[in-house]
Amino acid sequence: MEDLQPINPNTDSPTETGATTIEARFSYFCKGRLTMDDNALEEAMKLFNQSKHLFMTNASALGSGTPEEAEHYWFAFILFSMKRLSKKNDAEDAAKSNENSFKLYQILRVAKLNFVDFFKELPQFIVKTGPILSNLYGSDWETRLQAKELQANFVHLSLLSKYYKRAFKTLFKPSHDNVEGQSAVANSADYISNCHRFGWLLFLALRVHAFSRFKDLVTCTNGLVSILAILIIHIPARFRNFSMSDSSHFVKKDDKVVDLLASLCNMYETSEDELRKTMVRTNIVVEEILKKDPSMASECTNGNLDNIDTDDLTYFQDLLEEQSLSSDLDILEKDYDDAMLLEGELDERLFINDEESLLGSSSLSGGAINMTGTKRKIDSMTSPTKTITSPLSPYKSPSKMISTPVSTAMTTAKWLRTVVSPLSSFPSVDLTRFLQSCDKDVTSDVIKRARIILEAIFPSSGIPDRTVLSNTQTTNLMDNIWAEQRRLEALKLYYRVLHAMCKAESQILHGNNLTSLLTNERFHRCMLACSAELVLATHKTVTMLFPAVLERTGITAFDLSKVIESFIRHEESLPRELRRHLNSLEERLLESMVWEKGSSMYNSLTIARPNLSNEINRLGLLAGPMPSLDAIALQCNMSCGGLPPVPKRDTSPGKSGEIRSPKRVCNEYRSVLVERNSFTSPVKDRLLGIGNLKSKILSPALQSAFASPTRPHPTRGETCAETAVNLFFSKIVKLAAVRINGMVERMQLTQQIRERVYCLFQQILGQRTSLFFNRHIDQIILCCFYGVAKITQLSLTFKEIIFNYRKQPHCKPQVFRAVFVDDRSSSRRGKTGQDHVDIIMFYNEIFIPSVKPLLVELAPSNVPKNPNNQVSETNKKDESGPCPCPGSPKVSSFPSLPDMSPKKVSAVHNVYVSPLRSTKMDALISHGSKSYYACVGESTHAYQSPSKDLTAINNRLNGTRKVRGSLNFDEVDVGLVSDSLVSQSLYLQNGKGPASSSGQELKTE
């Protein structure tokens, strides 16, 4: 299809108002610019008319806020949704639709928008029009829309194209650098440019014809490396930017010839076995599509393969020769055009054309990757839960390439390939011993469950792809091979971490009987989901983005949040990128997903906070029962491989595995593993405590860790549900503290403001918990900032708060543009029937009426309080515990943030240290290794007080300016040498010196 011309801005003035005018502009956009037929126009107009009132309300929030740009955004959203969600009745309609269809890239070109900006603005359209799309296209509209998958695919292709361009530039010279060329090829200025384009088009053909529908980043990178091998073999050697004699880059076989594939694997961190398999597929694509005759590489006589081991290499006659290159490009272009008729909203050739006006140039995240490759600032603080590093992490290999998202993914895949893949696909002997030590042998149950759950996550048959009308046997076979490989990787990782957890539990409890842990259905599903998610994150799979593992295993975000910390803790070799992925995942769970409708957290909350039950039930937030293994197997249309039917679980009260009761759909447990090292400091627990959170978290007996949520805890005087909710709330407050601190630093606010905002957030979580229901915690944080600013008479507008929030690495525009409200209970004036409003309206009409009494209590002493808004005596009593008066100068209510880098600590703040409690020190350091450590509070010398140690350290740090001209090995107390002294001595050695120091002797103090 020919590229469409941009819309004429003079057709209808965008500043004109009125329904008729905007409808006319939309009609012209569809019919005049996109040449839509009448049926498609009618359907598009129907969706436009039903959502028009939402556009009129939110137009100023789209893009830069100009009327014309806002209209174009809305037009693009409407047409994209309509095209993706329209159901074709039969194959004839589908074929006709494909012939006359338009693609997303064509919509954006007409609207003069780019992909990056489109994907950034799309989420708020989805949030606001969700009910309309559900009514028109069914409840599964979001799954069929595949917006997140399309965005991830765009990000992956952006990264891959940059990766390919960088590698091509490294390997081959630009044609104008070839000054010695005598042939027609050398005289062609466009030859290398055409070869570059040929490589990308061949890669796209490989994606279409040879790869499975699971086009993950690792597989695609292997494909690109195979393309580079094809180019090296066939592009004349004079265009190379390297020499085969360079031993630092190439692996030589028998110290004579270069092993090309092994060398490329060494350069680009790919698996040699996988690369050789991919080379076979690439050669088949060249042979079948370009109709080239393959021959043994040893038969090549043009000198291209001199000094290269030709074993297992294929050479194609006249491939990449000047006389045939143009026709080969035409064939690949035609092949891709045919593929675009069947699937795809994105013309992937755009990435090689450098069409920045259509692609966009700013950053965009997709899945677990960011196009810019920059590390999020929040990662420097990691998760709200503590992460323990290990000497084995991160897993690195000596790479000569600069670090990019693609190279990082390949390094992570190498960990999976070298550490996990060699393991057994069955429980180890040690793990089997734990499984057999339960009240009954659960080995077969564990194996059977793992097979069913992983088959559900990685189905052999594959989930039907609406954009693919037919699949060949080859594609189905590749799908099954890919799924089987991922299942095995996840299974081996699951068994490995499960054994580490069992070993740790047995050491704590001094016994191998772990029945409560190993018979808990929800625990195992969470572990399997976590293992599968790490495998998916390693391969960067576009079609299976989080939370796919939650949906396919039948667990909720609240369930998964309980095992993430333990998983990280007990897999010491986990690469840094995967640790970061799990930490980022935990942030997503805590900030919003746990608060969504259907979260099992609400089932626990009804028991832990009975006063919230009515609101939870009224909003319909409770999670449904966790589906049985039989139901999961049936839903995936797969066989259990001859396994016996899964027995029905006992739903009687008090059973550890009960999952049927809606009130107790989540087995609320707190494993010793999760709690043992979390929030154990009494000071932190007092500052982070919510409601009746105890000042010290004790390790519960394993028998009660997985008991019914309503069962009383044996040592804490509270139910297991209360214990789980309190731990969850403590993580929420720690995450909020990190984000509040980031906003305070960005806006340069005082410590008093920071503490008041933090204190207010704590009180809302403990006393106005319902404000978090169906919302994002950042929405509450932003409102807390403005509320505190008003009560303290600080000159800070909501616009300034949002402006600074947009600069935060975790910012999402829909956070302040679409806040959930329930019109059935609110008394909003002029309500529009929306389920989501902007944050200022939420603040004025929902937040303030609920929080005003708490705000009044936070007012400074010089600000008079309104007696009508005094908090009840009960609330005052509750507040005095976890959140002391912010004016108190003795103890700050703001907690110490986790894993802070020394560079993150402001120089204007004093840093204090306190002695390490002997009980904690003994737990961390064994008797035999104490001599290797120096603990604050314990002297490093016999009969010497710790204060003298600190004094000595301070003297050394403060005395660095007193340096010596030469090192004196006879004295013990030798000062440190400054950088300036070293620099000066180097000048003197070179016979050069600053004028001020020329001829002067170095002083020794």
UniProtKB/Swiss-Prot annotation:
Xref: PANTHER family: RE32990P-RELATED, RETINOBLASTOMA-ASSOCIATED PROTEIN RB -RELATED
Region (Pocket): 404-853
Assigned keywords, A-Z: Cell cycle, Nucleus, Repressor, Transcription, Transcription regulation
Organism, as annotated: Pilosella piloselloides
Pfam families with a match to the protein in the record: DUF3452 (PF11934), RB_A (PF01858), RB_B (PF01857)
Family as reported in the entry's similarity comment: Belongs to the retinoblastoma protein (RB) family.
Region Domain B: start-end pairs: 723-853
Polar residues bias (residue ranges): 863-873
Protein name: Retinoblastoma-related protein
Major localization class: nucleus
Molecular-function GO terms, alphabetical: RNA polymerase II transcription regulatory region sequence-specific DNA binding
GO cellular component, one term: chromatin
Annotated stretches, region: Disordered: 863-899
SMART domains cross-referenced by the UniProt entry: DUF3452, RB_A
Subcellular location(s) of the protein: Nucleus
